[in-house]
Amino acid sequence: MLTSRAEIILRSIVRQYITKAVPVSSSSILEDCGLDICSATIRNEVVRLEIEGYILRPHHSAGSIPADKGYRYYVESLKDVELPTNDKFLIRHLFHQVEKEMEEWLNLTVAVLSQRVQSMAVVTMPRQTQGKVHHIELVSLQDNLVLVVLILRGAKVKQQLVNFENVVSQPELTLISNRLNDAYDGLTRFQIEQKPLGLNHDELKVKDSLVKMMRGEDEQESREPFFDGLHYMLEQPEFHQNQRAQEIMQLLEQKKLSKMIVPPMPFNRGVQVYIGQENASAEIRDYSLIVSQYGIPDEAVGTIGVIGPTRMAYERALSAVSYLSLVMSTLVAELYGKAPVDKDE
């Protein structure tokens, strides 16, 4: 745990480096932090911060730059940051100006977020997290060949052929359909798999068919995310070397980046921050990722976020991602006829 003085010095280093993108000297820290101490004390504190892994000094005669651990300490102190009221009003106004269509909202979201953070923003289309049974129908085609029709919540229809052991009549299939509808209405595939029902061999085949169709729907890849703001990120000093710019461009062109920056996480409307080495994918461990989910739990959930170098304007990014996820959750709730999220106007 850092002392209060060390924390003030670390925050000064992080803030100045984020703003200026050059190593921070002891004299700059002394001018910025407002502590009544001498330069020698600053230098001693800087050495301790380096030993403990919070900062890096490329050369001992040069200034300090934050390490991932230093950024993490800084970010933890920003958990409750919010957008200014005027900015919230402006964002609401912008959303009221566009058509009430999901693609319009998503395009506006990434445009606003990337402009505010001056980095690349991403948002995914909200999709159902787990399919739920709405209705099951079994149709006799010929002899023992049966068509299993599954209607999911949201009116998605799936169907699959199943061979029964013996010839079965349509009235018998209707009885099985009714039994399964009573048992499985509103359930996810996980709940169906765990629900004991005492099924016979043919009914188990139907159950397996239902689970297979629902798994395919659950695992179906969502549409490619909406991106904006690549030009902001490439203007940062970290990308003045062509190699790094080419690497991020290749990830975008090969459609790898979308999978890397939309990590699976439980829906909680909270903002998650992944700094440098905290990212699961080795290819983005020189970056920071700030993401949040939005939408309606268990019905329609998307992801909104921003990616950029670890030298990111975290305060702006956290507040913008948090507020835009709230705005999008409210819009999705209204679209689905649900109670709106607190608009926090």
From Swiss-Prot:
It comes from the Bacteria. Gene3D superfamilies: 3.30.450.40, Heat-inducible transcription repressor hrca homolog, domain 3, Winged helix-like DNA-binding domain superfamily/Winged helix DNA-binding domain. Keywords: Repressor, Stress response, Transcription, Transcription regulation. SUPFAM superfamilies: GAF domain-like (SSF55781), Winged helix' DNA-binding domain (SSF46785). One of its GO terms (molecular function) is DNA binding. One of its GO terms (biological process) is negative regulation of DNA-templated transcription. Pfam families: HrcA (PF01628). Negative regulator of class I heat shock genes (grpE-dnaK-dnaJ and groELS operons). Prevents heat-shock induction of these operons. Belongs to the HrcA family. This is Heat-inducible transcription repressor HrcA. It comes from Dehalococcoides mccartyi (strain ATCC BAA-2100 / JCM 16839 / KCTC 5957 / BAV1).
